[in-house]
Amino acid sequence: MAARLCCQLDSARDVLLLRPIGPQSSGPPFPRPAAGSAASSASSPSPSDESDLPLGRLPACFASASGPCCLVFTCADLRTMDSTVNFVSWHAKRQLGMPSKDLWTPYIKDQLLTKWEEGSIDPRLSIFVLGGCRHKCMRLL
């Protein structure tokens, strides 16, 4: 299962908006819950939230407080969608000075999203691809 989503940070509401790319792109955005939310990492959104989701199939962990477990940081330039690169590998080559992997999560949460908000981030990060997940997909009608 894969879905192409365009991510936008809404700092006023402290949410990450995920908008579908493709024929269903006219649907409403799905805001990721704030980090302080009480949802578990494997929980699915409530039935009232499901009607707001523009995609037909999403993993059950999609709306968890920690984000979807299947978020594979694969990115592509909007102009050349067929040439994707693995964001983790791509970024690791630029961050060789990081002392440990324990800094990766705080970096994503603080530094990367701050750069995104300021508009100083590389345009290759405009598209993320949701990849394989151990959770089952939920059908949205």
UniProtKB/Swiss-Prot annotation:
This is Protein X. It is found in: Host cytoplasm; Host nucleus; Host mitochondrion. Its main location: host cell. Pfam families: X. One of its GO terms (biological process) is symbiont-mediated activation of host NF-kappaB cascade. Multifunctional protein that plays a role in silencing host antiviral defenses and promoting viral transcription. Does not seem to be essential for HBV infection. May be directly involved in development of cirrhosis and liver cancer (hepatocellular carcinoma). Most of cytosolic activities involve modulation of cytosolic calcium. The effect on apoptosis is controversial depending on the cell types in which the studies have been conducted. May induce apoptosis by localizing in mitochondria and causing loss of mitochondrial membrane potential. It comes from Woodchuck hepatitis B virus (isolate w64/pWS23). Belongs to the orthohepadnavirus protein X family. Keywords: Activation of host NF-kappa-B by virus, Activator, Apoptosis, Host cytoplasm, Host G2/M cell cycle arrest by virus, Host mitochondrion, Host nucleus, Host-virus interaction, Modulation of host cell cycle by virus, Transcription, Transcription regulation. Residues 68-113 are annotated as: Mitochondrial targeting sequence. Residues 33-48 have a biased composition (Low complexity). It comes from the Viruses. InterPro entries: Transactivation_prot_X. One of its GO terms (cellular component) is host cell nucleus. The gene is X. Residues 22-52 are annotated as: Disordered. A fraction may be phosphorylated in insect cells and HepG2 cells, a human hepatoblastoma cell line. Phosphorylated in vitro by host protein kinase C or mitogen-activated protein kinase. N-acetylated in insect cells. May form homodimer. May interact with host CEBPA, CFLAR, CREB1, DDB1, E4F1, HBXIP, HSPD1/HSP60, NFKBIA, POLR2E and SMAD4. Interacts with host SMC5-SMC6 complex and induces its degradation. Interacts with host TRPC4AP; leading to prevent ubiquitination of TRPC4AP. Interacts with host PLSCR1; this interaction promotes ubiquitination and degradation of HBx and impairs HBx-mediated cell proliferation.
